Amino acid sequence: MAAGGRLEDGSLDILQSTDDDPLLDTQPLPHHSLHAHFRPRFHPLPTVIIANLLLLIHVVFVTLAFLTGVLCLYPDPNEDKCPENYTNPLKVQTAIILGKVILWILHLLFERYIQYHHRKVRSRGYSQIYRSTRHLKALALTIHSSGNTALLLLLCVQYSFPEPNKLYLELILAVLALELICSLSCLVLYTVKIRRFNKAKPQPDVLEEEKCYAYPSNIASETGFRTVSSLEEIVEKQGDIIVYLKRHNALLSKRLLELATQPART
């Protein structure tokens, strides 16, 4: 009897402790609410519009440079001046070179812009798109810097050997045309990659690999060791995953606290 009383008292104590626990008073959150709060939100890369705009500016500049060179210099190659004074007070080659410098500055600003947004994408867990466009992001600026070097070399030679002026103009236009072709290919390839990424709206790489584990296929996961990958690439990817998981856990903890305090507020 005494044991039964103690057991009964103990059960009452347990019931009282569970009833007094404020954490157990909260109602369980519905599944759709948790899914809506904890599912990572996709942020598309906003660099496609800027890339297309810069590409249009480049095409317009090269077209104007060719028209200016043909209409202004070819009638009198030794004069280096427009008959209608379109570039007055500048000479034709000077106007073309100044336009080229402005275009290079625009590409430099664009490269900084896309580097900023790609670093943000990498911090959100999209390491694959960051690595696949790593060299492509700076390739356009490298092409324009190489074109600037070629133009500087031509101007140095022209300064020492002024004649024939028409040949130097043809070489300058050839450099601009080659630069346009290379830069066009680079920016188009970059735009296609980013458009596919934005259209697919994938989840972070960690969650995409969880899908591969949940639904096995012939696609090998990149988290583990791969014989075709270098050790540096594997370590870099593991570091990106750790940074993303730390950031994601911090956001989850914050949202859990917000959701846990909502019933108390109501």
From Swiss-Prot:
<dbReference type="Pfam" id="PF14802">
    <property type="entry name" value="TMEM192"/>
</dbReference>
<keyword id="KW-1133">Transmembrane helix</keyword>
<feature type="topological domain" description="Cytoplasmic">
    <location>
        <begin position="190"/>
        <end position="266"/>
    </location>
</feature>
<dbReference type="InterPro" id="IPR029399">
    <property type="entry name" value="TMEM192"/>
</dbReference>
<feature type="transmembrane region" description="Helical">
    <location>
        <begin position="169"/>
        <end position="189"/>
    </location>
</feature>
<dbReference type="GO" id="GO:0005765">
    <property type="term" value="C:lysosomal membrane"/>
</dbReference>
<feature type="modified residue" description="Phosphoserine">
    <location>
        <position position="230"/>
    </location>
</feature>
<dbReference type="GO" id="GO:0048471">
    <property type="term" value="C:perinuclear region of cytoplasm"/>
</dbReference>
<feature type="transmembrane region" description="Helical">
    <location>
        <begin position="138"/>
        <end position="158"/>
    </location>
</feature>
<protein>
    <recommendedName>
        <fullName>Transmembrane protein 192</fullName>
    </recommendedName>
</protein>
<dbReference type="GO" id="GO:0005764">
    <property type="term" value="C:lysosome"/>
</dbReference>
<comment type="subunit">
    <text>Homodimer.</text>
</comment>
<feature type="modified residue" description="Phosphoserine">
    <location>
        <position position="229"/>
    </location>
</feature>
<keyword id="KW-0458">Lysosome</keyword>
<feature type="modified residue" description="Phosphotyrosine">
    <location>
        <position position="213"/>
    </location>
</feature>
<keyword id="KW-0597">Phosphoprotein</keyword>
<feature type="modified residue" description="Phosphoserine">
    <location>
        <position position="17"/>
    </location>
</feature>
<keyword id="KW-0812">Transmembrane</keyword>
<keyword id="KW-0472">Membrane</keyword>
<comment type="similarity">
    <text>Belongs to the TMEM192 family.</text>
</comment>
<feature type="topological domain" description="Cytoplasmic">
    <location>
        <begin position="1"/>
        <end position="52"/>
    </location>
</feature>
<feature type="transmembrane region" description="Helical">
    <location>
        <begin position="53"/>
        <end position="73"/>
    </location>
</feature>
<keyword id="KW-0967">Endosome</keyword>
<feature type="topological domain" description="Lumenal">
    <location>
        <begin position="74"/>
        <end position="89"/>
    </location>
</feature>
<feature type="transmembrane region" description="Helical">
    <location>
        <begin position="90"/>
        <end position="110"/>
    </location>
</feature>
<feature type="topological domain" description="Lumenal">
    <location>
        <begin position="159"/>
        <end position="168"/>
    </location>
</feature>
<dbReference type="GO" id="GO:0005770">
    <property type="term" value="C:late endosome"/>
</dbReference>
<dbReference type="GO" id="GO:0042803">
    <property type="term" value="F:protein homodimerization activity"/>
</dbReference>
<feature type="topological domain" description="Cytoplasmic">
    <location>
        <begin position="111"/>
        <end position="137"/>
    </location>
</feature>
